[in-house]
Structure formats: structure tokens, C-alpha cells
């Protein structure tokens, strides 16, 4: 009998749809607009969220119909997660793909969807909706915190 949680005992490819969906911690960081530098390919996060991101819950306000409103929304799949370099370092999909464990604040570990926010990992209170700015000014909103959240825990583990 295997007493390990599914994210420790299965690969991404072996997960059921409900297991896959539950790997999302609800941080909202993947829904922040990013800028890609054309010549280098470098990707920079901004604090500007997709128009569909609910700033309080950090979940998509129209998940099932998101492509009707945001045709270029990137759907994370078992096949493409290994190739998406911009996933935040705390992303459950990225962690499991890399053979790492989920953080203590992940809802699957804590049992509470609010811990991702209480731990300061999510976009809650740190992002602005793209409908509230002139997108020509997107460069003014470049931030590094989506790539540095959770580093304190990583430092403690080292």
C-alpha cells in the first residue's frame, strides 16, 4: 500500500484530471502579463494581471471560457509544463515536474486555499488588472517578485 500523496507517487502524465487541476496553488502568478525581449528571448514578469484574473481569489474569473476573451491564454498541460521556462519557481506543476515536493503553504499540503496568500506567495494585493492601465506602459510594471517568492524557504533547505 502506497501512503504517499499522489504528487509524490505519480508523474504528471499519470495524474487524473482532478489531481492535475489540484496542483494549481491559486497564486495567480502565471496570469501576470510578461514581456519577452525579442533579441534575447528573456522573459520579464510584470505586476499587471490578465483581465480575467480575480485579484482577491487569484483565480480566473472565466476559466472554462477564457479563450473566448483571451485567445492567447496559455493552457498548462502535462505535455507543455516541462517546456515553459517562465513558470514561477514555486509553481506546483513545475515542482512536481522537477521531482520536488510542494511547499507547506500549498493547499494540497495545508488543506487550506488561503495559505498561499497568507504566506505572501500569491499576486493578491500586488497586481493591477490590465484593464486599469495603458498597455503601452507595460514596461513600467516589470517586477522580479514572481521569481523570488519562496526563496526564504529554499535558503532554509540549503
Curated annotation (Swiss-Prot):
InterPro entries: Puta_zinc/iron-chelating_dom, UCP006173. Belongs to the UPF0260 family. HAMAP family: UPF0260. This is UPF0260 protein RL1394. It comes from Rhizobium johnstonii (strain DSM 114642 / LMG 32736 / 3841).
Amino acid at each position: 500500500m502506497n501512503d504517499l500523496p499522489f504528487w509524490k507517487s505519480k508523474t504528471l502524465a499519470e495524474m487524473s484530471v482532478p489531481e492535475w487541476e489540484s496542483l494549481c496553488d491559486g497564486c495567480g502568478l502565471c496570469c501576470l502579463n510578461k514581456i519577452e525581449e525579442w533579441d534575447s528571448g528573456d522573459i520579464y514578469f510584470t505586476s499587471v494581471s490578465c483581465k480575467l484574473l480575480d485579484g482577491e481569489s487569484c483565480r480566473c474569473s472565466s476559466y472554462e471560457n477564457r479563450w473566448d476573451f483571451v485567445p492567447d491564454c496559455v493552457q498548462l498541460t502535462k505535455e507543455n509544463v516541462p517546456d515553459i521556462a517562465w513558470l514561477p519557481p514555486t509553481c506546483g506543476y513545475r515542482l512536481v515536474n522537477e521531482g520536488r515536493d510542494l511547499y507547506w503553504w500549498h493547499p494540497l499540503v495545508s488543506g487550506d486555499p488561503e495559505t498561499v496568500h497568507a504566506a505572501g506567495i500569491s499576486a493578491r494585493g500586488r497586481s493591477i488588472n490590465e484593464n486599469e492601465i495603458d498597455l503601452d506602459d507595460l514596461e513600467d510594471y516589470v517586477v522580479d517578485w514572481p521569481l523570488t517568492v519562496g526563496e526564504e524557504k529554499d535558503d532554509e533547505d540549503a
